[in-house]
């Protein structure tokens, strides 16, 4: 008879303990009802990024001196810098600059150590594509067009038109 009574007492204690734990969980749930939502409705609302957010890298072709510091400080040697040595002026001329954001770890070393500040981090974080090769950005996709305004075909056409030569 005594083991039966202790069994009922243990069962009762376990029941009370379970009810207390359920009540604690319910109280935590109720305490969250007055709080603001943590999630955002992504396509319709944009995430407000902090000042130091490391998003897509912006590149300014005109400022780059092809020193390749960005390649040396990158942990994965990611930026591809193609340049040509101009022998008459003994300077490097930048031909092509590209970064593959499918491989980039967004550490920011290239931006931090660039001597001419031609690289900067933007707030852009949407990189969704169906093909991973679309994540390889060249200098045109990274920033401004790498051609001077006078070399542009549209500008040359306008400058060579007879109407502009009259005025």
Swiss-Prot record:
InterPro entries: 4Fe4S_Fe-S-bd, 4Fe4S_Fe_S_CS, NADH_quinone_OxRdtase_chainI, NDHI. Keywords: 4Fe-4S, Chloroplast, Iron, Iron-sulfur, Membrane, Metal-binding, NAD, NADP, Plastid, Plastoquinone, Quinone, Repeat, Thylakoid, Translocase. GO terms for biological process: photosynthesis, light reaction. The keyword Transmembrane helix does not apply. [4Fe-4S] cluster 2 binds at residues 74, 104, 107, 110. Residues 55-84, 95-124 form the 4Fe-4S ferredoxin-type domain. Transmembrane segments: none annotated. It is found in: Plastid, Chloroplast thylakoid membrane. GO terms for cellular component: chloroplast thylakoid membrane. Its EC number is 7.1.1.-. Binds 2 [4Fe-4S] clusters per subunit. Its cofactor is [4Fe-4S] cluster. It catalyses: a plastoquinone + NADH + (n+1) H(+)(in) = a plastoquinol + NAD(+) + n H(+)(out); a plastoquinone + NADPH + (n+1) H(+)(in) = a plastoquinol + NADP(+) + n H(+)(out). [4Fe-4S] cluster 1 binds at residues 64, 67, 70, 114. GO terms for molecular function: 4 iron, 4 sulfur cluster binding; iron ion binding; NADH dehydrogenase (ubiquinone) activity; quinone binding. Belongs to the complex I 23 kDa subunit family. PANTHER family: NAD(P)H-QUINONE OXIDOREDUCTASE SUBUNIT I, CHLOROPLASTIC. NDH is composed of at least 16 different subunits, 5 of which are encoded in the nucleus. NDH shuttles electrons from NAD(P)H:plastoquinone, via FMN and iron-sulfur (Fe-S) centers, to quinones in the photosynthetic chain and possibly in a chloroplast respiratory chain. The immediate electron acceptor for the enzyme in this species is believed to be plastoquinone. Couples the redox reaction to proton translocation, and thus conserves the redox energy in a proton gradient. HAMAP family: NDH1_NuoI. This is NAD(P)H-quinone oxidoreductase subunit I, chloroplastic. It comes from Lepidium virginicum. The lineage of its organism: Eukaryota, Viridiplantae, Streptophyta, Embryophyta, Tracheophyta.
